[in-house]
Curated annotation (Swiss-Prot):
Entry protein name: Thymidine phosphorylase
Keywords attached to this entry: Glycosyltransferase, Transferase
Gene: deoA
Annotated function: The enzymes which catalyze the reversible phosphorolysis of pyrimidine nucleosides are involved in the degradation of these compounds and in their utilization as carbon and energy sources, or in the rescue of pyrimidine bases for nucleotide synthesis.
A GO MF label: 1,4-alpha-oligoglucan phosphorylase activity
Amino acid sequence: MFLAQEIIRKKRDGHALSDEEIRFFINGIRDNTISEGQIAALAMTIFFHDMSIPERVSLTMAMRDSGSVLDWKSLNLNGPIVDKHSTGGVGDVTSLMLGPMVAACGGYIPMISGRGLGHTGGTLDKLEAIPGFDIFPNDTRFREIIKDVGVAIIGQTSSLAPADKRFYATRDITATVDSIPLITASILAKKLAEGLDALVMDVKVGSGAFMPTFELSAALAEAIVGVSNGAGVRTTALLTDMNQVLASSAGNAVEVREAVQFLTGEYRNPRLFDVTMALCVEMLISGKLAKDDAEARAKLQAVLDNGKAAEIFGRMVAAQKGPNDFVENYAKYLPTAMLSKAVYADTEGFVSAMDTRALGMAVVSMGGGRRQASDTIDYSVGFTDMARLGDSVDGQRPLAVIHAKDENSWQEAAKAVKAAIQLDDKAPETTPTVYRRITD
């Protein structure tokens, strides 16, 4: 038996906590025997004193074990359970293609996703732009979809890592969100509850990233890889670029439209293709579905070319109560905005920099995201045909096409787009889409 205040005191004085002490505290968070003040105190001591790798592993596993952990053995699946997690960005629609692509190559992807947070779009919000799409199937149905289709994308239920929800709510109001050990545990507790064999992390870098600097993004990636491997799940991470909108669109329905076009081959944004393929390659290699990069890329290209990935996306949508013919008739089903027109730069030039965070917030301001949990989303609004870094813009080539609910909203968004995109008289140097691969 431990005392919460003694655990806090021990960490306050700079000592490492034992696995038993950490589990006692996390179970107390779950059971409401630890007060909010005590949670806040421990969070602040961790913020200032950090945690060793063994402590981080213990914290992550204790938070994972505070709820149910999915077990797939009874399904006798003939492939690995794999997933991807992104730290979030703007126009980051990779999950919608990646899940079906990896499933088409023999993986099983039980993806538990989130809603939009701040300037970043949420995979669940995007999928809810599809009429009828059910993000909360019951456990039996979820397992059926994984076995039959190979991929399902659902929301977090109250039974998964419940201690994390209360811990995060306290961190949010005590300025302790941006602590690497606490971020690591929060992300991995939910992901490891999926019962994974392998995980790939997509950690964003740049003006639209969660972490403000390259160094902090790299530190977070290294922490997650170290802890997840320490917890027994094969994990790698990619540092990917978020200095511009990743896809050609940003919003909900507009990104779903682009995802379908990507899968069918109608249109593939080159940067989105690079990042999606790189993440899928990691999943295939970590899941032992391919021996190397070349074999993985060949398999992935094949399932795009032969339509198998698009078919699996369509089957997932239908299995989660969306339309049976969504892939074939997406334009009929996705909501469209009342007003769609282009915004042009005031001068000619090359796009030299982009405040990606500001562009994400512009989508939120149009109604495409939430400022608070009770807000409703306008799934139709957003940007398409986004200019990319290095593009020459003028009276013919717009900065973006804005999809808005009315003229006032369009004008506000146009102002935000112009302010967020810098022009220069010469093109900037090209930056990579993937900066670094991190392994244990």
